[in-house]
Amino acid sequence: MKNNSVILRNKTTKNLCFYLKEIAVVILFSQILLAQPKISGLASEPGAFSRIGFGARGIGMGNAMSAVTTGNLVSYYNPALTVFQEGNSFQTSYSFLSLDRSLNFVNFTRKFDFYSKKDSLNENREPRSTAGVTLGIINAGVSNIDGRDNNGLKTGELTTSENQFFVGLANKFSKKFALGINAKVFYYRLYDKVHSSGFGLDIGALYVVNDQYTVSFVVSDINSKYKWDTSPIYGQDGTSTTDNFPVLMKAGVGYRNKELKLTASAEFERSNVKTNIVRFGIEYNIYENLFLRGGLDQFDLSNFDSPAKPALGFSYFETFDNIVIGIDYAFMVEQYSPQDRHIVGLNVNF
């Protein structure tokens, strides 16, 4: 009887150890699965190239630009900004990116002041209304893609080209309030005979609280989407699909202190793909025509696994007669890339 009881206890102990090991393995694997980082909701959505930013100045300030009303402005960040542009502003930027990627920007912004004939004799007359217009292009692409057929044989190098063309119009309804709209056309050439185009809208508003503070509200990518048709390549086996861009809603605050020569801004952006992003930016006129910048972009409150993107930059300006020419530079961290982003720009104000 003793031997039987000993054998029974040994079997029970072995079974218990076996089950405990199984439970430990299940717990271990569940912890590994739960520990996987969440993927950024915006990064995997269509039109990612159009959400990187615009130009060296904006990227250097963490893209927190929707409430900034000084310097060279672009309606990309807020269509209402163009009415605050001083002079005629032309900007262009080129980005140095890894993995054979390219990203380029071109923009022209101007405001128009309209006066009343009744004020023609008044030396210090003020405009009765102000309008603004922006024309811009964003171009992105990937080159040197190794093309191969079903047998693995090389067919040549492939390239992609993704573009956004936009026109922004704005009106200043009073000294404190401005409203604007962007009309955007997208064109994406993905492969031979496979391309797509789309149309979208941005609507933005800006309110001047006082000489130091401004607030903004913008809704971006309304109706923006790509429509694809692969039947030119696959014939009857081809399919038609529609990829909708995420709709972005953001609110911003801008601060300017003329005595300290300081400009600061902050934004909160929410999308319909459940991202809640915070941005910060600062610009300091450290010496005459030299400006230093810093910022933080893509700080997602709903996904701390998605890394934020710090940025730095500067601008230097020289005046030639009535023309101001400036050089811009921005650096932004890109965590999952062999190298970080470098953006070099040229701006002309006349």
What kind of feature is each model-predicted range?
Residues 36-350:
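Subset of outer-membrane beta-barrel
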Residues 6, 22-26:
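Acidic, Ala/Val/Gly-enriched low-complexity intrinsically disordered segments
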Residues 18-19, 28, 75, 199:
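Hydrophobic transmembrane-helix microenvironments that flank and shape a buried ionizable site
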Residues 12-22:
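A cross-taxon signal for low-complexity, glycine/charged-rich
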Residues 2, 9-14:
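Charged/polar low-complexity intrinsically disordered segments
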Residues 30-32:
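N-terminal signal peptide c-region/cleavage motif recognized by signal peptidases
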Residues 1-2, 130:
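A broad structural signal for short, well-ordered beta-strand segments within beta-sheet-rich domains
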